[in-house]
């Protein structure tokens, strides 16, 4: 066996602890059918020369313009775009780049973006033309845009966004503003079969009509949209700004309040052949954009729902919704906002705008309860119109307008109870106007496909904070849901006071010698337990809890490992929540944490990674985590990101501590986990010594206490060392089969058996008692043999 093969096997073996697992089948034919061939294309960069240091030399391909200092972009031949955040036209350029490219890294002064096939698909879906994209890049770039980039943009946008599947008056139409594209599609025999025919068997005529588009979301006069938060007058007063940039933003992002007339050509298709039509169009590289003309849908009844007068949208929330409803119809797609930035209000506003039956899917029962609370808080919907469908709460769905459930309930494949089966039949039989998908990137792509086949919705809106997955299924989900409609900049929201200003810190905790000796010797999963239960980590956690409780802060401590979670919480006398905790007990602990001044610290396992709404929390301490998962790190930071009352924007008002045992695998994982947040502009402060820790009275101060803890950890089974598996929630590994390595004693069930010998001298009081001759022969020393 070659070295490469051995390394490959080794990497597969260790995959469970290195990256976040997304359980899914190998991508087969069905998986590929949902993704256009152009989606996998990358920018080709073969002409760059490398210097002696390995850096790429682009001077020949990127000649500088004479006024390059006034322009904010560098467009590299490999598809990477660099934006100067200190440019006077930064706001204009940033809005354009968010529309056409994926953010890679956004620190303080220079932002990096990358052109991808999917980002360009998203750009054309919101109305940008190929010529617009290339023209604006040329205007904003300090250099000439490389020819390879121009060709890549043309290749990816030549067919994307040109054809739409529109639902009008409960009839499906394939619509386009390009008559030649419609004619090209109709030449295909499969699409010709999907076309609706009249009673005589003849094809229905092509429909030519003038479509008047007007945004369904009215533009707020106070929100200061247009060029985001920058002032247009200030830009025009700058003498170093080129004249051709003045009208740039107005051209790129037209004011959608003005009515615009567009001539379209369309033909009607058979409803029962929609799925086949979509697959065929993707095969022809003309993916259908789903748009829902909800205003003209007379078949599905309007529901009685409006926003309350107290619900005021923030500028970025309003902008994201204008991207969704920009042409008077509802576009399917993804809105990316940080945790705590008000994603729920965006979802409720979308439901109030469409005013058709709405299905909301979350990833836990707690998420369902919180979505119900959000609808009652922000909208005028009557409580009787909201129906929950979880394992604990199955409301009667009679005449219900808003249904809220979890992915696991809908994707459940085994036998259901009679009551659950009736609710599922009701969900399947309804025609849903809007489906809100909360953090759908946390579930496997295969499960999401199953959910899509069970319930049909005219418009799908995904709300997420982290558009990342550790597997390669991100493209599948992107094309199944729709394009990215809007993505916010975390640092801008923080500087504006919309989310908390967080101090992130990585606290290095030295391993005690006894624990480290065992850590080096043991090769099983118990290593994870050893660095999690490190006494110095426990002391650091206890010190931070005491320090912040004296400041009247509200603290959440996260631990993926249940053994560690219980040990920490019970020893410190704090309440804890994990998978088996009953729903009623969970809600009671959370309510006490929110309102009881005596309960300032709670311990939570990975069940609290998403959908736990705890706006009062302002300190988060992480003692164990899921390998190198970037998404989990961002989701956990989100628990303390909600804006704090009476906050001062210049000062840190929230704290995120990640406790890491030094010289262990945990340090490598920690670096990987921080990648996403560092790319958003956050910086992690490394703390090697906590000031004042020596003066505190903390647990495990003596060697004897540490030795007792070590014995307890060594007596734990391999199962105790594994992370929690949350039953009934996708995104967790299903417990069907597991393979573990261990000793023969462990496999034979003798994990808890410890052989101990110790000698003790008999006291005078006991010397008079009758002793068996076998023991009396040994004199005063008695040998005690104990098997635990």
UniProtKB/Swiss-Prot annotation:
Enzyme superclass (EC): isomerase
Positions of short motif Nuclear localization signal: 3-15
- Motif placement: DEVH box: 438-441
What InterPro entries does UniProt report for this protein, alphabetically? ATP-dep_DNA_Helicase, ERCC3_RAD25_C, Helicase/UvrB_N, Helicase_ATP-bd, Helicase_C-like, P-loop_NTPase, XPB/Ssl2, XPB/Ssl2_N
Ranges where the Helicase C-terminal domain occurs:
539-699
Identify the Pfam families for this entry: ERCC3_RAD25_C (PF16203), Helicase_C_3 (PF13625), ResIII (PF04851)
**Where in this protein does the record put region Disordered?**
1-46
Per the entry, what this protein does is: ATP-dependent 3'-5' DNA helicase/translocase; binds dsDNA rather than ssDNA, unzipping it in a translocase rather than classical helicase activity. Component of the general transcription and DNA repair factor IIH (TFIIH) core complex. When complexed to CDK-activating kinase (CAK), involved in RNA transcription by RNA polymerase II. The ATPase activity of XPB/ERCC3, but not its helicase activity, is required for DNA opening; it may wrap around the damaged DNA wedging it open, causing localized melting and twisting that allows XPD/ERCC2 helicase to anchor.
Please identify the protein, giving its name as recorded. General transcription and DNA repair factor IIH helicase/translocase subunit XPB
Species name:
Gallus gallus (Chicken)
